């Protein structure tokens, strides 16, 4: 009994002197490996990893057959596994049957003016849905006019869909005057010294008198197209007025 204790103490003292372990760590059984031992452990670890890699890439054997990879999915080799039947040459993968001569014979040929999947067939004698346009045929509500014919606008019809103007609107016709709501007058042309229409005195004004007494732009109901064959005077702003 005493001999075993002496041997244990000698072994402990030898371990303490051979390593850099503190007395506290030695008492708990801690040891410090030398540099050579650490390098050897690293070499063993690398070698073990490389061995496992070589095993995964090894040639087919009892563990890894030729047509069974590591992931468990069978490979398509010379002999296909029985779990994967071959598809016949005339069988589509979608499950629908292919069209053959027998199937085509069962379906009659549609007539010339019949429907194929809801789409009408157009033949030479089938009328079109779009009507032919004649000389005065309507197109979206508009009427064709010849070269010497001018369309007449209704009395209360706005032009280009614009609403009728009413109320006190600021003037934009500088140097012009409109009387009786229909007659166009213009100031004296300073360059030519001529007076177009009635003379106007005082500063340039733009007023409407008579039944349409309003200031500003005249209402559209005063605009009518010229009579056929007439050539009205034009204003520089594009409006045309007639009595």
From Swiss-Prot:
GO terms for cellular component: extracellular region; host cell cytoplasm; host cell nucleus. Keywords: Host cytoplasm, Host nucleus, Secreted, Signal, Virulence. It comes from the Eukaryota. The keyword Secreted applies. Its main location: secreted. Residues 187-243 are annotated as: Disordered. Induction: Expression is up-regulated at the earlier infection stages. Residues 199-216 have a biased composition (Low complexity). It is found in: Secreted; Host cytoplasm; Host nucleus. Residues 1-26 form the signal peptide. A motif (RxLR) lies at residues 49-52. Effector that significantly enhances susceptibilities of grapevine and tobacco to pathogens. Acts as a broad suppressor of cell death to interrupt plant immunity. Completely inhibits cell death induced by cell death-inducing proteins, including the PAMP elicitor INF1 from P.infestans. Reduces the transcriptional levels of the defense-related genes and impairs the H(2)O(2) accumulation in N.benthamiana. Belongs to the RxLR effector family. Has a conserved RxLR motif that acts to carry the protein into the host cell cytoplasm. Lacks the 'so-called' EER motif, which is found closely behind the RxLR motif in most of RxLR effector family members, but the presence of an EER motif is not always essential for the translocation of every RxLR effector into host cells, or for inducing a hypersensitive response. This is Secreted RxLR effector protein 28. The lineage of its organism: Eukaryota, Sar, Stramenopiles, Oomycota, Peronosporales. The gene is RxLR28.
